[in-house]
């Protein structure tokens, strides 16, 4: 059984006299920066010239610098940029400023695990990955709570890398909820698998296929939207709250019987074989190479797929229906 670590297990004093540079001020960046600041840590934010996030960071009372200056000034660097831009920013602005004894941090292991970023042997390389979006990381911290985190050590130059990772997790509120130790490989491969097979790829394909099946059979698109997309949140909320058991305990007997007897016909042996193939593509680096090359070539296929998905009938139906949802209008 995996062990969870909490506030008493981590020593925030390891960050007390350090300057932490948060590179990027998006969803995770703003949460990490503000939570660390409120934990009494000296924080600077590294942004590229002309960044639209600069004013937001300054309005929050944070010192903003360009990325190279932030990396130079900091003892601790946390890269919170999209995976596809990290390598270029690292090579241009961060690597020249990585002196011995510094800490290089990530919230996802992609670039380290797949060799896009190769750090010098003289720095600690760690990961602290909150298992929730940035707005939740920030909101729960302000409420005196936190979001569970994963933490890992890739390189321990100082002999303190593990303790440092735990201290950082405490600084952003993770140890209030509990943090779980992993490795860069395990986090990266399981994260990609979950995204592709279940959370994003699998769920999106399932929703669209269900919608298309009902519409093709002559049912109103609006009803198909409600049954195959809108109600997903109702079910997922129950699962998150208490697992599959709570969900099944909360739905009707009719729904539960249909779940248990028909669900296995959707995820077949062929589906499971495809899941294993997708996992092999992740483990071998095939997916990573494909993604890197796609971005290096200007994302032509990615852009075309985005355009095609945006034109799917479920998007237009959903747009019209959501306009009538009064509870969404204030968001």
Curated annotation (Swiss-Prot):
GO terms for cellular component: cytosol. It holds the Pfam family KARI_C. One of its GO terms (molecular function) is NADP binding. Residues 2-182 form the KARI N-terminal Rossmann domain. Substrate binds at residue 252. NADP(+) binds at residues 25-28, 51, 53, 83-86, 134. The active site is at residue 108. Keywords: Amino-acid biosynthesis, Branched-chain amino acid biosynthesis, Magnesium, Metal-binding, NADP, Oxidoreductase. It catalyses: (2R)-2,3-dihydroxy-3-methylbutanoate + NADP(+) = (2S)-2-acetolactate + NADPH + H(+); (2R,3R)-2,3-dihydroxy-3-methylpentanoate + NADP(+) = (S)-2-ethyl-2-hydroxy-3-oxobutanoate + NADPH + H(+). It is an enzyme of class 1 (oxidoreductase). Its EC number is 1.1.1.86. Binds 2 magnesium ions per subunit. Pathway: Amino-acid biosynthesis; L-isoleucine biosynthesis; L-isoleucine from 2-oxobutanoate: step 2/4; Amino-acid biosynthesis; L-valine biosynthesis; L-valine from pyruvate: step 2/4. Residues 183-328 form the KARI C-terminal knotted domain. GO terms for biological process: isoleucine biosynthetic process; L-valine biosynthetic process. Its cofactor is Mg(2+). Mg(2+) 1 binds at residues 191, 195. Mg(2+) 2 binds at residues 191, 227, 231. The keyword Plastid does not apply. It comes from the Bacteria. Involved in the biosynthesis of branched-chain amino acids (BCAA). Catalyzes an alkyl-migration followed by a ketol-acid reduction of (S)-2-acetolactate (S2AL) to yield (R)-2,3-dihydroxy-isovalerate. In the isomerase reaction, S2AL is rearranged via a Mg-dependent methyl migration to produce 3-hydroxy-3-methyl-2-ketobutyrate (HMKB). In the reductase reaction, this 2-ketoacid undergoes a metal-dependent reduction by NADPH to yield (R)-2,3-dihydroxy-isovalerate. Belongs to the ketol-acid reductoisomerase family. PANTHER family: KETOL-ACID REDUCTOISOMERASE, MITOCHONDRIAL. This is Ketol-acid reductoisomerase (NADP(+)). It comes from Crocosphaera subtropica (strain ATCC 51142 / BH68).
């Amino acid at each position: 059984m995996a062990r969870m670590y909490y506030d008493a297990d981590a020593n925030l004093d390891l960050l007390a006299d350090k300057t932490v540079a948060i590179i990027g001020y998006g969803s995770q960046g703003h949460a990490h920066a503000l939570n660390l600041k409120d934990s009494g840590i000296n924080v600077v934010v590294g942004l590229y010239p002309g960044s639209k996030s600069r004013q937001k960071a300054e309005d929050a009372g944070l010192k903003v610098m360009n990325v190279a200056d932030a990396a130079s000034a900091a003892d601790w660097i946390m890269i919170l940029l999209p995976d596809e831009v990290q390598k270029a920013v690292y090579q241009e602005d961060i690597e020249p400023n990585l002196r011995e004894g510094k800490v290089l941090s990530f919230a996802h292991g992609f670039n380290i695990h797949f060799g896009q970023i190769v750090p010098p042997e003289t720095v600690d390389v760690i990961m602290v990955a909150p298992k929730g979006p940035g707005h939740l990381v920030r909101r729960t911290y302000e409420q005196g709570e936190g979001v569970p985190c994963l933490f890992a050590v890739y390189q321990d130059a100082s002999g303190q890398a593990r303790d440092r990772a735990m201290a950082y997790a405490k600084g952003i509120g993770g140890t209030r909820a509990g943090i779980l130790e992993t490795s860069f490989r395990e986090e990266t491969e399981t994260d990609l698998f979950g995204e592709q097979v279940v959370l994003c790829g699998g769920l999106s394909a399932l929703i669209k296929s269900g919608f298309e099946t009902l519409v093709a059979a002559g049912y109103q698109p609006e009803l198909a939207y409600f049954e195959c997309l809108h109600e997903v949140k109702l079910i997922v909320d129950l699962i998150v709250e208490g697992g599959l058991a709570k969900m099944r305990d909360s739905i009707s007997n009719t729904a539960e019987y249909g779940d248990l007897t028909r669900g296995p016909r959707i995820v077949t042996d062929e589906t499971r074989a495809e899941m294993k193939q997708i996992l092999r593509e992740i483990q071998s680096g095939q997916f990573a190479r494909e993604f890197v090359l796609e971005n290096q070539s200007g994302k032509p296929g990615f852009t075309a797929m985005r355009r095609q998905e945006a034109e799917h009938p479920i998007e237009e139906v959903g747009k019209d229906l959501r306009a009538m949802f009064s509870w969404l209008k204030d968001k």
